[in-house]
C-alpha cells in the first residue's frame, strides 16, 4: 500500500478547500430569482461576500494545515455541506433546504471548534470567524425563508 506523507495530504486538503470555495462562490446571487427576494436590511452588498469568503477559506486552510490529522474527516464532511449550500440556494432555489444545510454546517463546525480548542487554540481562533459567519448567513437564509 502506498503511504502518502501527512503533509501532502494536508496540502491537498488546503487546495481542495480553496477549489471548493472558489466553485461555490462562483455561483452567486445575480439571477432574477435572487434579486426578486425580500432580503434583510442586514444583507450586505454582493462584494462583501467576495471579500469575506476568500478570507474565511484562507483561515480554514491554515487551520486544516495545522490540525490535519485531528479534524480531517469532519472537515471533509463540512466542506461538502458548505459546497452544496450554494447550489441548493442559488441553483435550485431551495432556501428552506439550504437553511437545514447551514444549520447542519453550524453543528458540525461547532464540533470541530470544540476539538480544536482541546488540540490547538490558535487554530480554533482562526476557525471561529467561519462559525460566526455561518450564524450570520443562517440569519440571512432564515429571513429569506420567512419573508418569501
What are these regions (language model features)?
Residues 87-99, 144-148:
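Membrane-interface helix caps and helix-loop-helix hairpins in membrane proteins
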